[in-house]
């Protein structure tokens, strides 16, 4: 499996993890902001 992919796996994992954290963070922030504004 060495030399097959051009993008290192750790870079893919880091980008994917960061994207998931950003999406989850935006979701919770939007829910929190929505609840705060509705109150």
From Swiss-Prot:
InterPro entries: PSII_PsbJ, PSII_PsbJ_sf. Keywords: Membrane, Photosynthesis, Photosystem II, Reaction center, Thylakoid, Transmembrane, Transmembrane helix. Signal peptide: none annotated. It is a single-pass membrane protein. The keyword Membrane applies. GO terms for biological process: photosynthesis. The chain crosses the membrane at residues 7-27. It is found in: Cellular thylakoid membrane. It comes from the Bacteria. One of its GO terms (cellular component) is plasma membrane-derived thylakoid membrane. Pfam families: PsbJ. Belongs to the PsbJ family. One of the components of the core complex of photosystem II (PSII). PSII is a light-driven water:plastoquinone oxidoreductase that uses light energy to abstract electrons from H(2)O, generating O(2) and a proton gradient subsequently used for ATP formation. It consists of a core antenna complex that captures photons, and an electron transfer chain that converts photonic excitation into a charge separation. PSII is composed of 1 copy each of membrane proteins PsbA, PsbB, PsbC, PsbD, PsbE, PsbF, PsbH, PsbI, PsbJ, PsbK, PsbL, PsbM, PsbT, PsbX, PsbY, PsbZ, Psb30/Ycf12, peripheral proteins PsbO, CyanoQ (PsbQ), PsbU, PsbV and a large number of cofactors. It forms dimeric complexes. This is Photosystem II reaction center protein J.
């Amino acid at each position: 499996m060495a030399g097959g992919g051009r993008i290192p796996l750790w870079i893919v994992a880091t980008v994917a993890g960061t994207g998931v954290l950003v999406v989850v963070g935006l979701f919770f922030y939007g829910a929190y902001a929505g609840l705060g504004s509705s109150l």
